[in-house]
Amino acid sequence: MYAIPYEYYEKYKIRRYGAHGTSHWYVSSKVPELIGKPAEGLKQIVLHIGNGASASAEIDGKPIETSMGLTPLEGLVMGGRTGDIDPAAVFHLIRNAHMDVDELDDLFNKKSGMMNCSLVTSLPSYIIQMSSGVIS
């Protein structure tokens, strides 16, 4: 849930949904097998890192929190998505850059993220180049 009036959840279903569920489920189900312990009692942070990226907190093999929200736009910075951004940035761009909703959607979902901040086109490539000192 978000800290907005509950009526918006009821009427418009605005809440955190998360994404990459199959990937998170697979990883969290493999960990007990790999470490030889049951899922019950395990606390995990599971990461999905690709051109899209997300994190989940899991207890007993079940997700209790996710980095993503209503859409995959919220959360970690991704290949082409902003990740978390101050909502006031939207108002600022509407007022000062005279952008409309479709332009902002395109900017935040396709023309931002790692590929536009660093000129590297994927998160795995970015991580490899960062760790090898090619970019900083």
Model-derived regions, located:
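A mobile "lid/hinge" subdomain adjacent to the ATP/sugar-phosphate binding pocket shared
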Residues: 96-136
